[in-house]
């Protein structure tokens, strides 16, 4: 079963390694994992620490990303419009939709948002947990939501065709976004709070609001969002089952958010890391597929879950 991963931070690794002089980072370090997992497309997002990154860092990061794309035309098919979405990949291995995980560095500048759009960014979250000039994430003041500038950015994103990701928003901001959205939005890498009470997870009412927008929720494999003690692949499967029961198959997808390659020089020893057993990297994705198929998920439902739901939502946004 071929997979569209709703959230990967591989581009953060691309930027880090290219700063150090490497080239062909995805081919060297990631492609074998993606191929083993059956990943043929993903939202490849650029994340930068909102407390330590300036706009110039975003510009440099995007330059490195486009260098990577140009150096590997046999790997990447960059989707920027509806024609790209539906056309053949011309033998490239991976469909890539560029995204931003947080917009803190752009301040409130619509001109900078336009620049990101021109760079090919087609999905974005307003914040990565923090409070910024646009909105408030889960670590910010619970009573603070969208700013007036944030409202304009949401409207502009919808107008231009940038899919809004609500995964890191606090509840106040979430509900303000839900109340003003006129197109489907997504929680690309979020789980159900009912099954795991973590502030990054969404309560049932929020999940239903995503559904009501016509959007989707991508189930997340990060250990902390699955179980507080001993998360494993079955906790991930339970999240899928729960959301399918609550939302229907048309509004559930996969947004794994694998972190095995991040901060490699600072990682703890494997036995000390809090990981999701049997679902640690892209290479493990087919383990999930096999379990879901054994549970009786039909082929057409699996197709929606693994790729088609994302395609449907992007059809509402791409020009």
Question: What are the residue ranges of the model-derived segments?
Answer:
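Electropositive phosphate-/nucleotide-binding environments in soluble metabolic enzymes
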Residues: 28, 55, 59, 233, ...
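Conserved active-site loop/cleft motifs that coordinate metal ions or position small ligands
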Residues: 43, 252-255, 301-306
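A generic structural signal for well-ordered alpha-helical surface patches
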Residues: 63, 234, 238-241, 256, ...
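Active/binding-pocket-proximal capping segment
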Residues: 183, 235, 260
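Short acidic/histidine-rich active-site segments
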Residues: 247-271, 278
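Mid-to-C-terminal alpha-helical segments outside catalytic/metal-binding sites
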Residues: 277-319
């Amino acid at each position: 079963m071929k997979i569209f991963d709703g959230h990967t931070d591989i581009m953060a690794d691309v930027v880090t390694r290219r700063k150090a002089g490497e080239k062909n980072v995805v081919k060297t370090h990631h492609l074998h994992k993606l191929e083993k997992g059956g990943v043929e497309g993903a939202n490849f997002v650029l994340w930068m620490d909102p407390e330590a990154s300036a706009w110039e860092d975003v510009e440099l990061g995007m330059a490195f990303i486009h260098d990577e794309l140009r150096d590997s035309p046999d790997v990447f098919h960059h989707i920027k419009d509806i024609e790209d979405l539906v056309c053949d990949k011309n033998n490239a291995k991976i469909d890539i939709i560029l995204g931003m995980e947080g917009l803190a560095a752009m301040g409130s500048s619509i001109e900078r948002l336009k620049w990101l759009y021109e760079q090919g960014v087609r999905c974005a979250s307003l914040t990565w947990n923090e409070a910024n000039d646009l909105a408030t994430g889960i670590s910010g003041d619970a009573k603070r939501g969208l700013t007036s500038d944030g409202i304009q950015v949401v409207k502009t994103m919808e107008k231009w065709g940038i899919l809004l990701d609500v995964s890191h928003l606090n509840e106040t901001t979430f509900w303000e976004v839900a109340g003003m959205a006129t197109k489907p939005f997504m929680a690309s890498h979020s789980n159900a709070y009912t099954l795991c009470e973590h502030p990054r997870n969404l309560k049932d009412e929020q999940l239903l609001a995503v559904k009501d927008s016509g959007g989707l929720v991508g189930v997340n494999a990060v250990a902390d969002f699955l179980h507080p003690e001993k998360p494993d692949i079955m906790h991930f499967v339970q999240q899928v089952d729960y959301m399918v029961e609550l939302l229907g198959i048309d509004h559930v997808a996969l947004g794994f958010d694998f972190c095995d390659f991040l901060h490699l020089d600072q990682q703890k020893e494997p036995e000390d890391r809090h990981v999701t057993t049997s679902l640690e990297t892209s290479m493990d994705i087919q383990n999930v597929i096999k379990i879901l198929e054994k549970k009786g998920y039909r082929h057409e439902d699996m197709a929606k879950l693994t790729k088609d739901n994302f395609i449907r939502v992007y059809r509402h946004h791409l020009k």
